[in-house]
């Protein structure tokens, strides 16, 4: 599975878990839709879930005039996924994580999602440097 596909499937899983409060394995199976699972995909989903508190704190510090629970569900899931990569996965360049998040926002979010996600992640990037 390509990393972009793994990110898309991870986003779908995290979105379902957040919205429907279903078990991670069930959400992952649903997102995979019969496809073979992938180590990177699993690392993303479980990594976000295991580190959600730290990730959410980092995101909250960089939200201007927004509360995390008021964000569009898909934007919140994209931010969590990308912030996880930026904070915890040293083998992936931060700019790659950001670009992938922006592409996910264009694909799954609304007209303003990509710009919003880019702004928040840029601030997180500055914090990490």
UniProtKB/Swiss-Prot annotation:
The keyword 4Fe-4S does not apply. It comes from the Bacteria. One of its GO terms (molecular function) is RNA binding. SUPFAM superfamilies: NusB-like (SSF48013). GO terms for biological process: DNA-templated transcription termination; transcription antitermination. Keywords: RNA-binding, Transcription, Transcription antitermination, Transcription regulation. InterPro entries: NusB-like_sf, NusB_fam, NusB_RsmB_TIM44. The keyword Transmembrane does not apply. PANTHER family: ANTITERMINATION NUSB DOMAIN-CONTAINING PROTEIN, N UTILIZATION SUBSTANCE PROTEIN B-RELATED. HAMAP family: NusB. Involved in transcription antitermination. Required for transcription of ribosomal RNA (rRNA) genes. Binds specifically to the boxA antiterminator sequence of the ribosomal RNA (rrn) operons. NCBIfam families: nusB. This is Transcription antitermination protein NusB. It comes from Bacillus licheniformis (strain ATCC 14580 / DSM 13 / JCM 2505 / CCUG 7422 / NBRC 12200 / NCIMB 9375 / NCTC 10341 / NRRL NRS-1264 / Gibson 46). The gene is nusB.
């Amino acid at each position: 599975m390509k990393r972009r596909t793994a990110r898309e499937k991870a986003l779908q899983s995290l979105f379902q878990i957040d919205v429907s409060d279903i078990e991670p394995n069930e959400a992952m199976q649903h997102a995979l839709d019969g496809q073979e699972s992938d180590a990177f995909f699993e690392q993303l989903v479980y990594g976000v879930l295991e580190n959600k508190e730290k990730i959410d704190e980092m995101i909250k510090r960089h939200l201007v005039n927004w509360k995390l629970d008021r964000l569009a569900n898909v934007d919140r899931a994209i931010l969590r996924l990308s912030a996880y990569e930026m904070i915890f996965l040293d083998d992936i360049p931060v700019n790659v994580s950001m670009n992938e998040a922006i592409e996910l926002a264009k694909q799954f979010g609304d007209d303003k999602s990509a710009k919003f996600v880019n702004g928040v992640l840029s601030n997180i990037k500055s914090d990490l440097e």
